[in-house]
A protein has these predicted regions:
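Conserved glycine-rich cofactor-binding loop
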Residues: 15-16
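Conserved glycine-rich Rossmann-like NAD(P)H-binding loop of the short-chain dehydrogenase/reductase
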Residues: 31-45
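The beta1-alpha1 cofactor-binding region of Rossmann-like NAD(H)/NADP(H)-dependent oxidoreductases
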Residues: 40, 60-72, 101
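Substrate-binding pocket helix/loop in short-chain dehydrogenase/reductase
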Residues: 94-96, 100-105
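Active-site helix of classical SDR
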Residues: 119, 155
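Residue(s) in the substrate-gating loop at a strand-loop-helix junction
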Residues: 139
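C-terminal helical subdomain
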Residues: 179-180, 199-248
């Protein structure tokens, strides 16, 4: 167990995909991981898995869009070393002309307001740690657009701006802000959720792409960035599969 063992890393959206993989990565790096998500059964199962592997983990059911719940949660921690803002997601792929405003609102609430809520609530504890790290998991959608992605792109652009502005505002404090922006990542739920459970549409997203990123690939990236020396700030790390050159340029094998 490393010197990080007594230090706390909080991961939002830890019930599956990148969040769960990041929890495993940070636990292996020696952090005491705090798993948060709405699906309590999932994070409790992950906490059990981590305990059985010899790691320190605890699960908290939390909806990041519920500010009162977030504030109550934050009172449990005097010092936090790492916050990974992973909770988020996409809904729908309709053009702007016909997009569902409810989807846009929900994506903004989860990706942006959720990140804002948790970051604001835990910033005092991150500062108190003496060398806190805020990770914002954005997306390449936060750095370029694509047809049918308006709502998600808008939310992720806002999340990118949140990270960039926070870094400017807290410079000189013992907290760094790291933005990790993944491209095409194939997880069990992202595309399936985006298309309302339509497995055929979800699979088409990755059709012909030999090796899209995995949740573990992104988790490795986050863990690497977090474990740099405290004076080193990875402002922005964009990670894509080799087959993807941009949001709209992807090599697909026939």
């Amino acid at each position: 167990m490393t010197a990080a063992a007594t230090r706390i890393a909080i991961i939002t959206g830890a019930s599956s995909g990148i969040g769960a993989a990041t929890a495993r990565g940070l636990a292996a790096a020696g952090y005491r991981v705090v798993l948060t998500a709405r699906r309590k059964d999932r994070i409790e199962a992950l906490a059990t898995e981590l305990h059985e592997a010899g790691h320190d983990a605890v699960a908290y059911a939390l909806d990041v869009t519920d500010r009162a719940a977030v504030d109550t949660f934050a009172t449990a921690f005097k010092k936090v070393a790492v916050l990974v803002n992973n909770a988020g997601g996409a809904l729908g792929a309709d053009p702007i002309a016909t997009g569902d405003p409810a989807h846009w609102r929900q994506m903004y609430e989860t990706n942006v307001i959720g990140t804002l809520n948790v970051t604001q609530a835990l910033l005092p504890a991150l500062t108190a740690s003496g060398d806190g790290t805020v990770v914002v998991l954005s997306s390449t959608a936060g750095h370029g657009t694509y047809e049918g992605g308006g709502g998600y792109v808008a939310a992720k652009h806002a999340e990118h701006v949140l990270a960039e502005t926070l870094r400017l505002e807290i410079v000189g404090t013992p907290v760094r802000v790291i933005e990790v922006a993944p491209g095409m990542v194939k997880t069990d739920e992202f595309a399936l959720t985006r298309f309302g459970g339509d497995a055929e549409k979800a699979e088409k997203v990755y059709a012909g792409v030999a090796e899209p990123l995995t949740a573990d690939d992104v988790a490795d990236t986050i863990t690497w960035a977090v474990t740099r020396p405290p004076h080193v700030n990875i402002d922005l790390l964009v990670v894509r599969p080799r087959a993807q050159a941009s949001n709209t340029k992807v090599h697909r094998e026939s």
